[in-house]
Regions:
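Cationic, hydrophobic amphipathic alpha-helical membrane-interacting segments
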Residues: 1-118
Length: 118
């Protein structure tokens, strides 16, 4: 069994392809989620502004509506953070999978591929 050196350029290309595949798929999901959520938050802000301007929202209830907007924004950001963390794990898993497979092939051994998040 002869050692088979790793083609570094190919390895870099394979890692980029693995990461890009995950990112393209997840970016579409993130983009759709973000667009819907931000539109809903913007619409709510518009309703609050109209309510304040027309006095339908009183001084007594104004803070309640503003706090609700803050909560919507915080919920959006927290959900986005969670989705991004999942995407980062997927990218890490894809890159490590490529690396471990390249090492296994070059060294003619079978290495168990670690998985982040398990």
């Amino acid at each position: 069994m002869a050692f088979e050196p790793i083609d570094l350029e190919q390895l870099v290309t394979d890692m980029k392809a693995a990461a890009s595949g995950v990112l393209k798929m997840d970016v579409a999901t993130l983009r759709g989620f973000s667009e819907r959520q931000l539109k809903a938050i913007a619409q709510q802000a518009s309703l609050v502004a109209t309510g304040i301007a027309t006095k339908q929202i009183t001084e007594e209830t104004e803070q309640f509506f503003l706090d609700s907007l803050e909560d919507m924004a915080l919920s959006f950001v927290r959900t986005l953070r969670g989705l991004l963390m999942v995407t980062i794990e997927k990218v890490w898993n894809a890159i490590v999978g490529v690396l471990w497979n390249a090492i296994s092939k070059a060294a003619k051994v079978v290495l168990p591929v670690p998985v982040l998040g398990n």
